[in-house]
Every structure is written in C-alpha cells, then in structure tokens.
Curated annotation (Swiss-Prot):
Required for the export of mRNAs containing poly(A) tails from the nucleus into the cytoplasm. Probable component of the nuclear pore complex (NPC). The gene is NUP42. Residues 252-293, 321-369 are annotated as: Disordered. A zinc finger (C3H1-type) spans 1-25. Keywords: Membrane, Metal-binding, mRNA transport, Nuclear pore complex, Nucleus, Protein transport, Repeat, Translocation, Transport, Zinc, Zinc-finger. It is a peripheral membrane protein. One of its GO terms (cellular component) is nuclear pore. PROSITE patterns: ZF_C3H1. The FG repeats are interaction sites for karyopherins (importins, exportins) and form probably an affinity gradient, guiding the transport proteins unidirectionally with their cargo through the NPC. The keyword Phosphoprotein does not apply. This is Nucleoporin NUP42. It comes from Gallus gallus.
Amino acid sequence: MTICQFFLQGRCRFGDRCWNEHPRGGGGRPHSAGPVRGAGGGWGAASQRYANVIQPPIFKHSTWGGSGDGGGFSGASDFGSPGNKSAVFSQNRFSALSSAHPADGFSDEEQRLLDCVAKDMATWESSGQWMFSCYSPEAGKPNVSGFREFSAEEVRLEYYNCSANNNTENYINSVNQLVQERRNRLQELKALNASGKESLLSQLKNAVTQPLPSLGFGGQQASSFGFPSFPVSSSSGAASFSFKANPSVPPGNAAAVGSSAAASNPPTFGVTSSPSVPNPVGSGNSSAPSAASFSFKTSGTTSGCGTSGLSGFGSSAAANSSSTAPLPVSATPSAATGTSQSGASSASAAQTAGASGHNVTSAPSAVPNGIASDKLYTPRSELTAEELEQFEAKRFTLGKIPLKPPPIDLLYL
C-alpha cells in the first residue's frame, strides 16, 4: 500500500480512515534500521525503507535566536544572536529622512520653498511672460525683492511722453536697464548660495505686507510709474490719475477726457457746441488737460437737466455751427445761428420742450453761416444760370447742387 506522505509530514487529516498506509512501529513490519535522529529526535524509529525521507527540522524556543548548541539557525554563524542584533539592524535606509538636523541646515518646509522659487524662475525665463511684474512664491507670502512692476499700458504711456519730448533714446536706455536688472535677479534666484538662501528666507518670513491701495470710486490711487523708481523722466501726468475730482477745477466745469480747454464750459442739454480737436496722450502740452481732470463725480451744483459736470447728453459738435449758448423754446432761429428749422419741426420741438422744461436747439443745416434760410423760394433774378439749370433738370449733378431754395414756379406740391 502506498505510504501516506501527509502522515510522514504529520498533517494527515483523515487519521485511521486514510486510504494510504500510516507506518507504525512493532512486529510484522520490515526490519528496522534504528532511529533516524536518535532517542530524542523526530518522530521515533523508522524503517530503513523510509530512511531517505527528509524530516522537517524541529525549532525550539531555546535554540531560536542562537544559544551556541549548533541547532536551528544558530551555531557557528551566530545569526540573530543577542550580541549581534545591534550590528545587523543598525543600518536604517530611512535614517537620513528622519534626521532632525539636515545636512544643509534648512528644514523640509524651507527647502521646499527654495526649490519652488528656483523652479518658478526657470519657468518664468523660458515661458516668455511679462517681465515687469512682481513675484511671490505662495499666496500670503510677501513679494520677492528685486523685481519692478509696471503694466504694459504704463510702459506705453511713458513712451508717448518721451516721444512727444523727442527723448526716445532715454526711454530705450531705461527699458534696457530694467530688463538687465530683472535678468540678473532672475539668474541669482535660480542658483542661490548659502547666504542668498538665508537672506531670501528671512525676507519671506520677516517682511511686512503693505496694505493694498483703494480702488473704489472717490479713493486715491497713485501709480508708481513715473516716480524715481522708474528710470525715465518723472514728468508723466499719469502719476496724478485719480477717480477723484480735481479741486482746482470749479464744479460743473470738468472737461471730458481728450477735450481741449475750450470745452471746459459745459454745454446744456442738447446744445450744439464748437468742435475741438483732442490732444494726443502724453503730448506734453501744458494747456492740455491732465488725467487728474478725469472724474466720475457729478457736479456740485444741482440744477436742471443738462448742467452736470460732464458734457451734456445728446450734445453734438457741428462743424458749421458757431453757437455756444442755448436757445430758449420760444425763440425763433435767426440767420446768425447758421441753422435752419422747418415749421413742423419747430412746433414739435417747442411742444416737447414745453412739456419737459429743457432747452432745445434747432436742427443743423447744410446752409453755410451768413446765408438766410427763412425763405421758401428764391426769385429767378437772384439765381445764376448754373443754378437755374440744376433746378430745371430732372436730377441734380453731384457737386453742383444749389444751396438756395428753388424759384416759386419750380415748386410742385
């Protein structure tokens, strides 16, 4: 019968009901060759037939860990002996990470912050982003020193001011100086030495965060562009820009942006005013209004509609009009105003203005100044041959259209 290998290993779960043979000691068995491991070892005396079976080693608590008897894993090697435990397990692969004193003298948080600054500088240099900007490694941290902050609009305005003063070369040199300063500071932050790291960390820890400027209407907002921090002339008018009304300008006389000093007197509602040519930005002309005259505040004088500080709503600058004073509702347009108004439109405007109480103006006409326009027709004796030819033709010729009313015999109702 086949010998049960599980019984030899001591883990047969069928016991006496096993189909294979469980060898026992005693008579009727083949001649025994004696015990395999002696009196105190193993599973006892076994036959020569099963002498080649490899027996599992017997582990004892007394010999595990090394006791000098040569059993188990102890013996000459003394593996795991109490005297050598410290020598075997003294090396810890994570001991460098758990060290309380790093080799460079910086904590993990400080080293992470320094690595972040160096990485940001490399990204900033290769990305081609706007160079005249401030920098902070994290939210809540103060800005790193050495970087000037100017917007593209401020740099453009400074160019206009220098160009108006024929000082473009100074502008170019100043911008190149700023670019070189920024490049040097960027390279310094990319490869910081020990003293530079300490200086940067102390700056990020001990610097005082300045309060943000007020951006609301009525608040003062001064730009640093044009100040001594920018190496260009400080004559720029952008430094005085404010949403606050200029106290030197009387209430109600604030001119619109880009308008000349001739338009400082505000026209009333719907009045035709004289045209004005706006001065270019940064022309340097002292008579041109500065940015400080720009204001969102209304006039201090509260009166009827059309008297606010800004130019009147609905007002238009007619190229052929010389009137700067409003016409009353009941007034009839005269020849001096250079405008014409039909009877129907005059009555309609009078009714509308009478209901609202606002001043109105007459509609502009193509008739030049000095020519009366209150006639409905012109006698033939006052017309030239060319004008009569145009009135008698079926269509007017472009460039030869008469500026006078036609004769009465050519009026068809």
